[in-house]
């Protein structure tokens, strides 16, 4: 019975992927054989596009491409409650793991004369290399580039690019390399 339920869940996820491909007229590119019974909440607007291949999702993940491009590499895993929000470009390399609650943004609300704009944004591309592990509740902000084979500890806020493989954690409100 469990195998039947899993099979039906995977079938439903593939139907959902097909629906997104049709509804968004080619702006969502996903292989129809989704590797998990879950498929994320998706929003594509203003010429945005989402591409993913053999990506495994857990529950309550969301991907928004509001004029931006989201490209998730083959074999990547997104745990529960991950959010990817793009106005420009977010690229995640192959075989990368995202822990629960990871948030990735390539834009911030623009602040004009001390007032936060609801409709204007400052954007910069984000890239994460292949074979990375992004720990639970990590936030990755605009303009960050992370090289391959990087581990980022839980709860870290990444505001600067990482160019050397290793393990990184936030310490005293600064991201510090620990090995």
Positions of PLM-derived features:
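Extracellular/periplasm-exposed beta-strand and loop segments of Gram-negative cell-envelope proteins
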Residues: 108-109
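Glycine-rich NAD(P)-binding loop of Rossmann-like domains
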Residues: 116-128
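Short helix N-cap motif at coil->helix boundaries in the Bergerat
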Residues: 160
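A generic "structured core" feature
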Residues: 141-142, 146-157
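Nucleic acid-binding interface residues in structured DNA/RNA-binding domains
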Residues: 169-171
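Domain-scale signature associated with acetyltransferase and cell-envelope carbohydrate enzymes
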Residues: 1-105, 129-130, 138-140, 148, ...
